[in-house]
């Protein structure tokens, strides 16, 4: 009995002895080097495979590769980039965050929560300092990453675009100002700037560059007509002229309504008809017609009265009942003209006056008559009737003479009336 009992433990020991050796051999076969992990698919024929991107295996073993540490979760900078054989090393906290220095696995907190004087925070904990990264693994030959600051520098393309914008905007502004200056200079010289090209009447379509407002449309237009046309081109002046004409017509109507009707004594049938108004000379259609008491020029109310020179007024003594007062009563507050000037047109500060020429006593009368010898009129008396006015007496011949209207001599044609255009304090003699 005793020998059999001793054999049983020995046999059990011999039976259990191969199991640790086999287990050790199988475990040693499944261990992988750093940077690799066991291959779970035995059909490939390999026991280990490289670690996938983003994972690492730092030592021998049969465990799979572990993922790299994410420093962003802890609000820290990467001090060392992870590889297949080492993990990522986290450094200091982000700018604006604080945490224990030298402990990369502890998450950082915002500087707004930090007390005064906390390391890594300044200006009441809202601006991060430029930290120094902790370089580790110098023996392993890993590359280190320089710490960054909180400012983001733009690329070279963005900087070039900013410089281009800064250079182009002033150029466009200067070009616009230069164009405005050129237009003002051209307007001073008489040109006018337009956005489109004007086609002139010539074959080439080009104009002379003169303002059309200063061109004389009619070659026979006199100076006063040109001045009136230039004045009436503006709306303000045209309105003022209309008011002046209305006032003139109203005064004429008032004068004619209150004027006593004067009848001329009956004249001989051969005497030419004379206008009873005697406000003007019959130079347009000759003598007045015999159709009515008023000539064709009187029927047109647009003709003004003839303003005689002071010498002619002094020489002639018109009948008070027949001739109206040719001078206009100046308005209250109106500026008096110079001595000898007769105002023809006055609109605001613009005034057209006539300067009579200084003639000798022999050149006083404006209408000259000559007598020629001829057959006497039987029905006319030898001497002018004493009851006739001076104008009819000038038309009637005395002692068998004939009266003719003659044109002034050639030298008198060259003599023209001078006019003064007065605007404010400056005078322009025409």
UniProtKB/Swiss-Prot annotation:
Signal peptide: 1-25
Gene3D superfamilies (UniProt xref): Tumor Necrosis Factor Receptor, subunit A, domain 2
Glycosylation sites: 149
Gene Ontology annotations of biological process type: amelogenesis; apoptotic process
Ranges of Low complexity composition bias in the record: 134-143
Cytoplasmic side: 184-430
Gene Ontology CC annotations of this record: cytosol; nucleolus; nucleoplasm; perinuclear region of cytoplasm; plasma membrane
Membrane-related topology note: Single-pass type I membrane protein
Annotated TNFR-Cys repeat ranges: 50-90
Residues passing through the membrane, by range: 163-183
CDD domains documented for this protein: TNFRSF19L
Protein name: Tumor necrosis factor receptor superfamily member 19L
């Amino acid at each position: 009995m005793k020998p059999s009992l001793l054999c049983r433990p020995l046999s059990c020991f011999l039976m259990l002895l191969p199991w640790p050796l086999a287990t050790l051999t199988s475990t040693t076969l499944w261990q992988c080097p750093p940077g690799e992990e066991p291959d779970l698919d035995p059909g490939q024929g390999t026991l280990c495979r490289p670690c996938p991107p983003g994972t690492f295996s730092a030592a021998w073993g049969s465990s799979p590769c572990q993922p790299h540490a994410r420093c962003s979760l802890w609000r820290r900078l990467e001090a060392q980039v992870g590889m297949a054989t080492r993990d990522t090393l986290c450094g200091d906290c982000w700018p604006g965050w604080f945490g224990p220095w030298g402990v990369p696995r502890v998450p950082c907190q915002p500087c707004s929560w930090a007390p005064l004087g906390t390391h890594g925070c300044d200006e009441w904990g809202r601006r991060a300092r430029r930290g120094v990264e902790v370089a580790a693994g110098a023996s392993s030959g890993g590359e280190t990453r320089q710490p960054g600051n909180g400012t983001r520098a733009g690329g070279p393309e963005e900087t070039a675009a900013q410089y281009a914008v800064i250079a182009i905007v002033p150029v466009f502004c200067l070009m616009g100002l230069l164009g405005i200056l050129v237009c003002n200079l051209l307007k001073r010289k008489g040109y006018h700037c337009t956005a489109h090209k004007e086609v002139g009447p010539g074959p080439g379509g080009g104009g002379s560059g003169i303002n059309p407002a200063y061109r004389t449309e009619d070659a026979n237009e006199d100076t006063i007509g040109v001045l009136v046309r230039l004045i009436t081109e503006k709306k303000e002046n045209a309105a003022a002229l209309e008011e002046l004409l209305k006032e003139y017509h109203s005064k004429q109507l008032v004068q004619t309504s209150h004027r006593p009707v004067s009848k001329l004594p009956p004249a001989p049938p051969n005497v030419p008809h004379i206008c009873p108004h005697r406000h003007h000379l019959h130079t347009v259609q000759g003598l007045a017609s015999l159709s009515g008491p008023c000539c064709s020029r009187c029927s047109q109310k647009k003709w003004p009265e003839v303003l005689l020179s002071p010498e002619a007024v002094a020489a002639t003594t018109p009948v008070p009942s027949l001739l109206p007062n040719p001078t206009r009563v100046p308005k209250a507050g109106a500026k008096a003209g110079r001595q000898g000037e007769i105002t023809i047109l006055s609109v605001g500060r613009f005034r057209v006056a006539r300067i009579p020429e200084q003639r000798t006593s022999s050149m006083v009368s404006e209408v000259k008559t000559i007598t020629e010898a001829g057959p006497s009129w039987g029905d006319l008396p030898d001497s002018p009737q004493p009851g006739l006015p001076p104008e009819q007496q000038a038309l009637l011949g005395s002692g068998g003479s004939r009266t003719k209207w003659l044109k002034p001599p050639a030298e008198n044609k060259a003599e023209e009336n001078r006019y003064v255009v007065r605007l404010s304090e400056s005078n322009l003699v025409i």
